[in-house]
Regions:
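A structural alpha-helix within SAM-dependent methyltransferase catalytic domains
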Residues: 159-162, 192, 196, 351, ...
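PLP-dependent enzyme catalytic core of the Aspartate aminotransferase-like
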Residues: 349-358, 364-395
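Conserved core of the PLP fold type I
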Residues: 63-193, 210-227, 234
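Walker B catalytic acidic pair
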Residues: 206
Length: 395
């Protein structure tokens, strides 16, 4: 269906639904009457087949303790093979309530207090807090931005940081939040080779893997150089981003190496005492096996791409010195306003003049990004038009 039809069928006004993005603005902002473009979830209902699967299960079954549904396992394996050319084995799969919890468990299982953990900056701020909450040190290795506003890695700088700080763990974001970069196999091969050379364990957060809106195809970290690095790696994902179900607390944790898997599960057993969420498994099985869900995802990507192209066209015409990073993956636009706005004026501009609630740049790596915002484009074109015109009008 076209984007107008998709909006009419699936867009929903979420105010009053206890949405963190819409109803939780007081948690992050100075006012509560803002158009929210911050939290990374969608303003769209999930596909009907998923809604039906959940409702049918609840109507027919009590919500008691369950064991893992083998249909769920088969659905995950099939999805990875069909969508991402990644051949998983059943015993590689374990789970966590969400990707960030899985990362925190990995930090607990594979590092010690005061160890150093590397990330490529700018990056999702929860990586930093996951490390600092566990008394580990984040080593943020800044990426370089070229004239096309694409970010690249200086591999020499990355390796020097690994050595100087005796880094034990690298958290990789693939695709990369907030910059929208979809990593190529060559790029990841260079990063992972450095990690292996210096005995650095790798976590690959692949939660945005299905949200590819540009020309670069998604490559799972698990398949880089035909799986050459899987013995030193854990990959994680979830349908929460792809099908807008973050409230269903479930993420796949994929661990090919048996020793690492045992170590992870042993740590997990100390902090978590159940391993099956029947509603999440029901939703995942429907999402990964029903043609309607896959068609819905295709329509979402078209919607997001149209929103991104509109935003870029209007902002770049009105504000020619603005810098917008190419959004090849995710539904998140990363925009630098430094040519027009001072760092100290960003919050006032967006909150009090534009009446918008973006994710502010410093949330992704500190004051170096204070003139940036990340805008969530998984909403109606009408909302994106309103936000775009407000920005142009107030700068």
């Amino acid at each position: 269906m076209n984007t107008a039809e998709f909006t009419s069928k699936y867009y929903i006004d979420r105010r009053g639904s206890h949405s963190r993005k819409w109803d939780g603005q007081h948690l992050k902002f100075s006012r509560t009457d803002l158009l929210p473009l911050w939290v990374a979830d969608m303003d769209f209902m999930p596909p009907q087949c998923i809604q039906n699967a959940i409702c049918n299960y609840v109507k027919a079954n009590p919500l008691g303790y369950t064991i893992i549904n083998p249909n769920y396992i088969d659905a995950v394996i099939s999805w990875y093979k069909r969508r991402h050319h990644c051949n998983l084995q059943e015993d590689w799969l374990t789970s966590a309530p969400n990707v960030i919890t899985g990362i925190m468990w990995c930090i607990g299982a594979f590092t010690k207090p005061n160890d150093s953990i590397a990330v490529l900056s700018p990056v999702y701020g929860a990586f930093d807090t996951s490390a600092s909450d566990a008394q580990r040190h984040i080593i943020a290795v800044p990426m370089k931005r070229n004239e096309d506003n694409r970010y690249t890695v200086d591999y020499e700088t990355f390796e020097i940081a690994i050595i100087e700080h005796d880094v034990k763990l690298f958290i990789h974001c693939n695709p990369h939040n907030p910059i929208g970069h979809v990593w190529t196999e060559e790029e990841m091969g260079q990063l992972f080779s450095i990690c292996r050379q210096h005995n650095v364990f790798i976590i690959s957060d692949e939660i945005h893997q299905d949200l590819i809106t540009g020309p670069t195809a998604f490559t799972s970290s698990l398949t880089v150089k035909s799986g050459a690095y899987v013995d030193n790696m854990i990959a994680m994902s979830s349908l929460s981003k792809s099908f807008n179900m973050a409230s269903l607390h479930h993420a796949e944790v994929i661990i090919p190496n048996e020793k690492l898997r045992s170590q992870f599960n042993a740590y997990k057993a100390h902090v978590y005492h159940t391993d099956s969420d029947v509603i999440a498994e029901t939703a995942i099985t429907a999402a990964y096996t029903h043609p309607e869900a896959e068609a819905w995802l295709t329509d979402v990507l078209a919607m997001v791409r149209e929103n991104y192209e509109y935003l870029c066209r209007e902002l770049c015409t009105a504000l020619p010195k603005i810098r917008i990073s190419p959004m090849d993956g995710t539904y998140l636009a990363w925009i630098d306003f430094s040519a027009y706005v001072k760092p100290e004026d960003m919050h006032d501009l967006f909150e009090n003049k534009c009446h918008l609630a973006p994710s502010f740049g410093e949330w992704f790596g500190g004051e170096s990004y204070a003139t940036f915002v990340r805008l969530n484009l998984a909403t109606s074109l009408e909302n994106i038009k309103s936000a775009t015109h407000s920005i142009i009008r107030n700068i």
